[in-house]
Amino acid sequence: MAAAIAFVQNDIKKVLAYSTMSQLAYIFTGLGAALWLFNTGNHEAGALVFGGALFHLFNHAMAKGMLFMASGSVIHEVHHAHDHLHHEGDDSEHDHASHHDFDAQDMRNMGGLASKMPVTATAMMLGSMSIIGIPLIGGFWSKEVIIGKTWYAYFHGADALLGPALLILATAGMTGFYMSRMWFMTFAGEPRNELVEHVHEATPWIKTPLIVLSIMTALGGFGLAVYGAVEFLSAEADYLSLHGHTLLEQIIHEVEHAFLPEDMQLRYVGWVTILLAFIIGPIMA
């Protein structure tokens, strides 16, 4: 429901707010699957999806914190540019009315901002990719665990989880659509308002934390996945480690597990998820 509402939002922060509700639903779906698996004696799978849900909370926090900060930077600069144009313009009653009616959070007043705010645009792209679950970026690793293990529970007798399993699969494509739409409306294409020419990148006090959060968003999820974050968060491991493998061996293991699981049913689920989130959703935007 939250993902569907995000489809039609023009307020950049409302898109992110409804996205947060949608991602929380992912987390709770994972916790529900974990509970069923624990109750049926499948403790290993239950622990993994429980750890995956907690891992997704971390990945989502990194990405969404950065996205809200980046969107705030965009809103501030758009508002500042509009004020600049207002003070340069005439002082008529109509001008005052249009000034007060202007919404700096409305993406319909943006467009083409990537050339004006390259750091912010890059940060929001990486954050959006993490929320979408683009392969190898942040949230992909935890979302893959939640979707895979929820379908695993259904395939092993949890008929009540068919609805949630279908919904989180469909939501993967919906997330790809509304997050791509947000980025394209804000940063791509031709400017839809003359104020865009007066927009510039934020100060280093904003850019620096954006860069730090972008690195954590892009690489943090991957790095933690390689070092066994899911097993650690599920209490299956006492600490983060490479489990006796070299770094390259562990990277290959995680990539194979994500893209080529032994269970063919889960392999198809994973490929459909990637198709919906990475290709169909963004193309439709």
PLM regions and their residue ranges:
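Membrane-interfacial helical/loop segments at transmembrane boundaries in membrane proteins
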Residues: 145-156, 227-264
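Hydrophobic transmembrane alpha-helices and their helix-loop junctions in integral membrane proteins
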Residues: 1-202, 216-223
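Glycine- and aromatic-enriched alpha-helical transmembrane segments of multi-pass membrane proteins
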Residues: 207-225, 259-285
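Hydrophobic membrane-spanning alpha-helices of multi-pass integral membrane proteins
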Residues: 24, 127, 206-220, 241-257
